[in-house]
Amino acid sequence: MKLHTLFFYLFLLVLCIINPVSVYAEGVAVDTLHTDSAKVKQLDEVSITAKNALKVSSTPLQELSQYRLKELNSLQVSDAVKHFSGVVVKDYGGIGGLKTVSVRSLGAAHTAVAIDGIAMGNAQNGQIDIGKFSLDNVDVISLANGQNDDIFQPARQVSAASVLNIKTVFPKFSSGIVTGKVAVKGGSFGLINPSANIAVKLHEKLALTCSGEYLFANGRYPYILEYGNAGDSTSKELRQNTDVENIRAEMALYGRDSVQNGNFKAYFFQSKRGLPGATIFYNTANFSSQRITDRDFFAQGHFERQLIPQVTIQLNAKYQYSFTHYLDPVYLGSLGKEENFYHQQEGYLNAGVLYNVLHCLSFSFNTDGIISALNADLQDFAKPVRYQWLTSISGKYVNSWLVASATALFTLVDEKVQSGNASKGYFRVNPFVSATFKPFNKINLRFRVFYKNIFRLPTFNDLYYGRVGNINLKPESTNQYNIGVTYQAYLADFLPKVMLSCDVYHNSVKDKIVAYPTKNIYTWTMLNYGKVSINGLDFSGEVAVKPHSKVMILLGASYTYNRALNVTDPNSSDYKHQIPYTPRISGSGRASLQTPWVDINYSLVWSGHRYAVNQNYAENRVEGFFDHSISASHDFIIKRHLLGINLECLNITNKNYAVVRYFPMPGRSWRATVYWKF
């Protein structure tokens, strides 16, 4: 049986289990999709999107609700994630440029990205491009260092050093059976971005949502090209090959009653874009000719049922297909171009059980199976298939002053190839422990600590890519240590919200997978060579000030100090140098003025200098930057519907700073949004 056929039947089997049970459940029904106002209020009180909800977490957990996302002048998930402390988003410029996220200098391959609690996969290079994800139908973005306190989460999330979870909007009906939102954005550099979200209540316990959007931008923004021996000469250029055209379509089905809930989501995304090249004098055109076409599809289902008050089970399933077409029309080879096609498939199944032994003590068991396959039109390509079996056993204790949890993760990996030799299998056991303490009854001051040992597997590119791949690679291992403190309070009507958190951490990485020259500078291979020692501090704070009953001022800030040093070889010239593209200091800020007449929002992202390569010399330095943006918005109520207008000015100071060396970001730009909620 072919691999894609096996994936299809496995996924179909799980859906047959999920859908009939979730829709035609027995028992006393509690209508969570109904419009009863009392029930809606009860849900809002515990909703994680509530503006003043108090968070209790034994690990650093940062969240941005849709209320906050509106204040950050963000178009994509990658724009919003820059406001989390401890995060570096490597951005190659423009809307269509590749954007990956590294947390606390561990690298993008150590960050899992999940959609509604089920992780995305990319066994080819281990990195998820978060620039592909729109904020159009996002409810909450959360980032957990280590892992969050939910011991019922799938084992796959436990297997990552950090997890970025994107939670989409759950349908809510204030009146009638149809609700939705249509919007259109437009702005500088040819941006046009219409979108629509529709939700239909099919039954008292069943709802359907459909969402879609189109995005186009030519991306032709001006920038200053510096040249000369000291960069003392400049010319004004226009960025080339930064156009992007995206199409996204989603459908989701939600069912829920008193003892169970389930959902099914199907997602399609297509992107055609240029890959902007490095801005090199006299050669800007040839370095900006590559094109890439991506098509991503996934279908996933979740089912959860309470068997008895003490026992809950869950099932999750996912099928994911990714296609990439890469074209370099000016490649200096015999064919005069380089063109490759990549097909990646993944099947995923999860089953879990949660047992509440006592009101304060619970245990969980989750087991996940993953099959990943990659095919490419490269000569003698290995066509690898990876089989993973992950099992997590977790426990959690909660009382009025203590939250403590522990997890043991068991990982079994095997690989097969159709050409050449396969990488050997692995078996690992990895621990995690965390706790948060509240020493004072009347003061919401908490101390937290966690330790996690985890690894990331070599990617298919690391193992099998041409002569560079090395099938003898070992997993890249990390140890994470964290001690922190949080404070949250309602101090007065004038100062209804104060939230502060500070964490100090130490991470160590061994067997780091790096490209290393073997015989000479032209012959490279992947090796377990690197060691990194990381020490840092993350701080974040948020304050709400209410000077008048109809006026609210929100202030927020984050700051990161990160000392990430290469400690591989004491005899090398880069020993104890800061690793590439890791600023020693960085941060963000935001301010919002909310009035009945207009809402004004200001946001800031800033970074200290970085180095483009391992050697921390002046010629390798990438300067720091400040990016200021401001917006004004107002909502009009028209016959119980809402018309909203939002105007934004991005990068006010018009600086073409670079996150990645020779890849300048756009200068000042404008964006306008009009939306209609019904």
Model-flagged regions — what are they?
Residues 310, 314-326, 447-450, 476-535, ...:
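Membrane-embedded beta-barrel scaffold of Gram-negative outer-membrane proteins
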Residues 510-511, 553-555, 606-613, 621, ...:
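C-terminal beta-signal and adjacent terminal beta-strands/loops
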Residues 30, 40-71:
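N-terminal periplasmic "start-of-domain" segments of outer-membrane beta-barrel proteins
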Residues 78-119:
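Extracytoplasmic beta-strand/coil segments of soluble accessory domains associated
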Residues 363-364, 401-404, 499-508, 527-612:
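Gram-negative outer-membrane beta-barrel transporters
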